[in-house]
């Protein structure tokens, strides 16, 4: 394992010449990634170097608040030296400090993180229990507050689009051996900012090192989970979309993906646009007003952008979603849209974090009032989604990868590999082997159970 971004960042801070960084990084890529050629390796390391240089420019901006947001508090103590994850005195101390951040939110749980128990508890009545977990955006490792903030929103969105009210959050954070402990606190503070804003407690989690003693560097790898409940009514799952429904969307300002684009292209002021909990508030309004019961399906525009979500809904619900391009573009925050268009990034292929609501037409006006959504399309018979642009009706299909939204992603590209079908067959076989192993162990457990 090698953290290329961390390597380049450290080299720049040590004033190592750029040609030396490229030369050494190029060799390391070829050494570790056996399936790439020299041309790709050189382009790749150059793109990483340019990205890191761009993000480092935030230290020169005049906006002190934004600068503080992007920096994390440095303790000068690494994960390894403090013994984090080693289940001793240093580890216990760090966990008590994490609990102190959680306590500062004043969002109550029945058994909270500050009690240092093995699990947290909240009280809830439920007809259905809904759970989701989201991984932190990989490129926000050096911006842990933003990473924690946006992954928490992502997990909560996944709960709310099912028609559930969130009742608890959990977190999992791994920081490599040389990472400053302050990164963990900054990440947790990002989670807790959302927790406090929407009144959902962070009740537990796990804190370890990436690879223990075996991985050096300061890479942060993390996730946040959310638990929600549906007290009455039915889930608003994608499969429930019906012919004749209308499609509404709220304004989306993006989350981790848009933040990453802003950071790695130097559009730092766009980051402010992403700092909101509008999506969650809109969903809470739907639940508390009772209008959630009138909605057939909801989703967040994230997975491969509108292209990906529309495609998946069509396949799952076996209906055709028809979108008006001009109206869809009105649901993208103007500053975010400007950035995407200037950088030649397809706005329909990235996560904009709009709330998409599919409902009967007779309830649309009431739903618009409590969410701020606008009507962008409708559902008809068929199994493919389309974008209407003037007289043109364009199929909405996802690319092999989402729109390339950083310089490195533009090097990697969006095109499907030529041997993709062969790759799928190999992946299927690996999955089959995993199922066989699971079945073997289940039988083993059944045999052992008979001894009692």
From Swiss-Prot:
<dbReference type="Pfam" id="PF00586">
    <property type="entry name" value="AIRS"/>
</dbReference>
<dbReference type="InterPro" id="IPR036676">
    <property type="entry name" value="PurM-like_C_sf"/>
</dbReference>
<protein>
    <recommendedName>
        <fullName>Uncharacterized protein MJ1416</fullName>
    </recommendedName>
</protein>
<dbReference type="Pfam" id="PF02769">
    <property type="entry name" value="AIRS_C"/>
</dbReference>
<dbReference type="InterPro" id="IPR010918">
    <property type="entry name" value="PurM-like_C_dom"/>
</dbReference>
<dbReference type="GO" id="GO:0009030">
    <property type="term" value="F:thiamine-phosphate kinase activity"/>
</dbReference>
<dbReference type="GO" id="GO:0009228">
    <property type="term" value="P:thiamine biosynthetic process"/>
</dbReference>
<comment type="similarity">
    <text>Belongs to the HypE family.</text>
</comment>
<dbReference type="InterPro" id="IPR036921">
    <property type="entry name" value="PurM-like_N_sf"/>
</dbReference>
<dbReference type="InterPro" id="IPR006283">
    <property type="entry name" value="ThiL-like"/>
</dbReference>
<dbReference type="InterPro" id="IPR016188">
    <property type="entry name" value="PurM-like_N"/>
</dbReference>
<dbReference type="InterPro" id="IPR009186">
    <property type="entry name" value="Ni_metllenz_mat"/>
</dbReference>
């Amino acid at each position: 394992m090698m953290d290329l971004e961390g390597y380049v960042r450290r080299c720049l801070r040590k004033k190592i010449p750029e040609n030396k960084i490229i030369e050494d990084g190029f060799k390391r890529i070829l050494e570790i990634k056996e399936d790439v050629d020299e041309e790709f390796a050189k382009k790749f390391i150059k793109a990483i170097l340019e990205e890191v240089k761009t993000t480092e420019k935030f230290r020169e901006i005049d906006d002190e608040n934004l600068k503080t947001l992007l920096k994390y508090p440095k303790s000068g103590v690494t994960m390894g030296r403090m013994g984090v994850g080693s289940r001793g005195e240093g580890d216990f101390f760090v966990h008590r400090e994490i609990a102190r951040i959680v306590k500062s939110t004043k969002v109550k749980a029945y058994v909270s993180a500050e009690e240092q128990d093995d699990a947290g508890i909240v009280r809830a009545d439920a007809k259905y229990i809904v759970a989701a977990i989201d991984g932190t955006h990989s490129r926000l490792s050096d911006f842990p507050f933003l990473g924690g903030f946006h992954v928490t929103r992502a997990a909560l969105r996944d709960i709310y689009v099912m028609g559930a009210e969130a009742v608890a959050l959990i977190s999992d954070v791994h920081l490599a051996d040389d990472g400053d402990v302050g990164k963990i606190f900054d990440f947790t503070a990002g989670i807790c900012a959302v927790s406090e804003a929407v009144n959902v407690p962070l009740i537990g989690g796990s804190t370890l090192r990436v690879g223990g003693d075996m991985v050096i560097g300061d890479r942060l790898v993390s996730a946040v989970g959310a638990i929600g409940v549906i007290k009455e009514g039915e889930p608003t799952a994608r499969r429930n979309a019906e012919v004749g429904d209308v499609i509404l969307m709220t304004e989306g300002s993006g989350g981790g993906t848009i933040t990453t684009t802003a950071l790695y292209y130097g559009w730092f002021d766009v980051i402010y646009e992403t700092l909101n909990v509008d999506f969650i508030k809109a969903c809470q309004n739907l639940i508390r007003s009772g209008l959630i019961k009138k909605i057939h399906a909801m989703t967040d525009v994230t997975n491969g952008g509108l292209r990906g979500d529309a495609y998946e809904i069509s396949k799952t619900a076996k209906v055709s979603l028809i979108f008006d391009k001009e109206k869809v573009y009105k649901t993208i925050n103007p500053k975010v849209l400007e950035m995407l268009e200037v950088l030649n990034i397809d706005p329909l292929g990235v996560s904009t974090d709009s709330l998409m609501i599919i409902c009967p037409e007779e309830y649309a006006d009431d739903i618009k009032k409590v969410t701020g959504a606008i009507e962008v399309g409708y559902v008809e018979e068929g199994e493919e989604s389309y974008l209407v642009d003037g007289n043109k009706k364009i199929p909405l299909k996802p690319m092999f990868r989402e729109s390339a939204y950083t310089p490195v992603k533009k090097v990697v590209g969006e095109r499907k590999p030529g041997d993709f079908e062969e790759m799928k067959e190999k992946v299927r076989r690996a999955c089959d082997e995993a199922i066989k192993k699971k079945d073997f162990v289940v039988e083993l457990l059944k045999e052992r159970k008979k001894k009692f």
